[in-house]
A protein has these predicted regions:
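Bacterial N-terminal signal peptides that target proteins for export
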Residues: 1-7
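N-terminal signal peptide c-region/cleavage motif recognized by signal peptidases
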Residues: 14-16
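Short, low-complexity N-terminal intrinsically disordered segments enriched in polar/charged residues
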Residues: 20-69
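Acidic, low-complexity intrinsically disordered segments
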Residues: 51, 58, 62, 66, ...
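Short solvent-exposed beta->alpha transition segments
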Residues: 57-58, 73-130
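Exposed beta-sheet edge and beta->alpha loop/turn motif
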Residues: 115-168
Length: 168
């Protein structure tokens, strides 16, 4: 991923989720290798994952709604420090606005996945725990659906905040 794509994809919005819920989440390894077998979750852990997915999905819907209504600056205002350390508000807003202008208005959006990742220091992505909400979105000026991604980072205060928004 190019630095500009990474910068454009980093942003934050508060989502409700507790640290104990994150502790129950299996994380994906950073390296591009097959994931180790995931541990079997207890029914209580699975219920926590399901609740967290619903909360994060609601938060992601708010983010895309703000982007859809040209309120991208508000997304940046609530972003994680991880995102704010990589891109300033003006760059974030102008990059997303330019990308969305090319695509036109969203016509249909379907959530296709909620994924979890953990990154260690020294990589292309800042260290930490992330949850991503992936949409297949049809836009007025795009013949095929576009992958729309909203990422959240678990900040030091144990609050999930938007760490990215990207289109591919």
């Amino acid at each position: 991923m190019s630095r500009s794509a990474l910068l454009a994809s980093l942003l934050v919005f508060t989502a409700a989720a507790g640290a104990q819920q994150q502790a129950a989440q299996p994380a994906r390894p950073v390296a591009a290798r097959p994931a180790p077998q995931q541990q079997k979750l207890t029914p209580e852990q699975q219920a926590q994952v399901t609740r967290q997915d619903a909360e994060i999905t609601k938060a992601a819907a708010k983010v895309v709604q703000l982007v859809d209504t040209s309120k991208t600056g508000e997304v940046w205002d609530g972003a994680s420090k991880v995102a704010k350390n990589l891109v300033n508000r003006q760059t974030f807003v102008s990059q997303i606005s330019a990308d969305r202008k090319k695509l036109g208005a969203p016509a249909e959006r379907k959530r296709v996945a909620v994924t979890r990742s953990a990154y260690t220091a020294g990589g292309q992505v800042p260290a930490g725990n992330y949850i991503n909400v992936v949409y297949a979105t049809k836009f007025a000026n795009a013949p095929q659906p576009v992958r729309e991604l909203v990422s959240f980072h678990l900040d030091d205060d144990k609050t999930w905040r938007v760490s990215g928004y990207s289109l591919r």
